[in-house]
Regions:
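Short edge beta-strands and adjacent turn/loop segments
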Residues: 17-34, 39
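N-proximal, solvent-exposed amphipathic alpha-helical segments enriched in charged/polar residues
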Residues: 1-20
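C-terminal structural segments of small proteins and small subunits
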Residues: 55-86
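A short interface-forming secondary-structure element
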Residues: 34-51
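Short, non-transmembrane amphipathic alpha-helical segments
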Residues: 7-11, 48-65
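Residues that form or flank phosphate/diphosphate-binding pockets in enzymes
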Residues: 2, 30, 45
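Short Gly/Pro-enriched loop/turn and capping motifs at secondary-structure junctions
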Residues: 28-30, 42, 77-79
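Histidine-centered active-site/metal-ligand motif
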Residues: 24, 32, 51, 68-70
């Protein structure tokens, strides 16, 4: 069973300082997660590229099946602010 904090840490360590990562276990089973990530690294990148950047540090968990499902919401800081968030 995976811990949301471990997932958050892996994603956060792969992105520039100042990135914001939130991870929630959506089923309580430790294998289905949802992440919301805000990072300058996403500026100028399409959604597919952004998601690839987030999935990269999780590849080993996806390959072994430890991480079964991971829903992503990724934003540049500007996109995040346009949604009314700070």
């Amino acid at each position: 069973m995976l811990d949301p904090e471990m997932i958050r840490r892996r994603i956060g360590e792969s992105l520039p300082p100042g990135s914001h990562v939130e991870v929630v276990d959506t089923t309580g089973t430790g294998d289905h997660f949802e992440a919301r990530v805000v990072s300058e690294a996403f500026v100028g990148k399409g959604m597919v590229q952004q998601h690839q950047m987030v999935y990269a540090p999780l590849q080993d968990l996806l390959k072994t099946g430890e991480l079964h499902a991971h829903a992503l919401k990724t934003y540049s800081p500007e996109q995040w602010q346009k949604l009314g968030n700070r």
